[in-house]
C-alpha cells in the first residue's frame, strides 16, 4: 500500500502515488545520508482514474523528463475533450477514432468524456478490453463500453472508438465510415508528429 514503509537494515523504503496510471508509484528511499525519491512517468494533473500525484519532500529527486522541453505546454484536458465532442456533433455521419495507449490513457479519456456529459456507448479495440475491465473491477466507473469488433460500418457513424495508436494507421480503420482520427498524446504538441501520424484532430 502507498505510504507504508519497509525497513531494510538502516534504510526505509515506501511507495507513493505517481498520478500516472492506476497503481503507478514513486519510490522514496531514506537512509542516514538523506532521502531520495525515484519515479518513472508521473502526472501532476488531476486524473479521475488513479490516485493523485503526491509531492514527497526529499533531498534528491530522480525523474525522467519526456515532456520537459518548453514546447510541451499541454492544454486543459476538458478543452481537448470539448474539441472532440464538438467534432462529433459537427460530423454525425463520420466515426471518430481516438488513438490512445491501452493502459491509463484510454481509461482517462473515457472518464473525461463521461465527466463532460457524454453518455453514449464508447467502442473499444480488442486490445483495450481486458485492461479497461480491470479498471472497472477496481471501482473506476467508465459507463457503457462496447467492443467494436463485429459492429456494422454504418452503425459506427457518430460514435467514438478508442484504439491503440498503431491501429489508427492500419487497414483496421477501414471498418469505420470516413473516420476522423485523433490521438490522445502530449506528442501532438509537435506538429510534425501529428502530420506524420495523419491525425486530423490533434
Could you tell me what each predicted segment is?
Residues 1-100, 104, 115-116:
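His/Asp/Glu-rich metal-coordinating catalytic cores
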Residues 3-8, 22, 129-131, 152-155, ...:
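A short acidic, often aromatic-flanked loop/helix-cap motif at beta-alpha or helix-coil junctions
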Residues 10-17, 135-141, 197:
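Short, surface-exposed amphipathic charged segments that create phosphate/polyanion-binding patches used
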Residues 35-36, 59-61, 95, 121, ...:
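Structural motif
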Residues 42-44, 66-68, 126-129, 185-189:
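Short, acidic/turn-prone active-site loops that include or flank metal/cofactor-
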Residues 47-49, 71-73, 130-138, 154-156, ...:
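Short, charged, surface-exposed secondary-structure boundary motifs
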Residues 81-96, 100-162:
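Hard-cation-handling environments
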Residues 139-140, 147-202:
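C-terminal regulatory/interaction regions
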Amino acid at each position: 500500500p502507498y505510504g507504508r514503509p519497509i525497513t531494510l537494515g538502516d534504510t526505509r523504503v515506501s511507495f507513493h502515488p505517481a498520478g500516472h496510471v492506476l497503481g503507478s508509484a514513486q519510490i522514496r528511499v531514506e537512509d542516514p545520508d538523506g532521502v531520495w525519491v525515484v519515479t518513472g512517468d508521473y502526472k501532476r494533473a488531476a486524473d479521475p482514474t488513479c490516485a493523485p500525484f503526491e509531492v514527497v519532500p526529499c533531498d534528491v529527486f530522480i525523474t525522467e523528463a519526456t515532456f520537459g522541453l518548453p514546447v510541451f505546454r499541454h492544454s486543459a484536458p476538458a478543452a481537448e475533450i470539448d474539441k472532440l465532442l464538438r467534432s462529433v456533433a459537427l460530423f454525425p455521419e463520420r466515426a471518430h477514432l481516438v488513438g490512445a495507449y491501452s493502459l491509463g490513457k484510454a481509461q482517462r479519456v473515457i472518464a473525461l468524456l463521461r465527466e463532460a456529459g457524454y453518455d453514449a456507448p464508447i467502442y473499444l479495440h480488442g486490445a483495450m478490453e481486458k485492461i479497461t475491465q480491470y479498471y472497472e473491477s477496481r471501482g473506476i466507473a467508465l459507463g457503457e463500453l462496447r467492443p467494436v469488433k463485429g459492429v456494422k460500418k454504418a452503425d459506427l457513424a457518430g460514435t467514438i472508438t478508442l484504439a491503440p495508436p498503431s491501429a489508427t494507421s492500419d487497414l483496421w480503420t477501414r471498418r469505420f465510415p470516413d473516420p476522423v482520427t485523433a490521438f490522445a498524446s502530449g506528442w501532438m504538441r509537435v506538429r510534425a508528429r501529428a502530420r506524420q501520424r495523419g491525425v486530423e484532430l490533434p
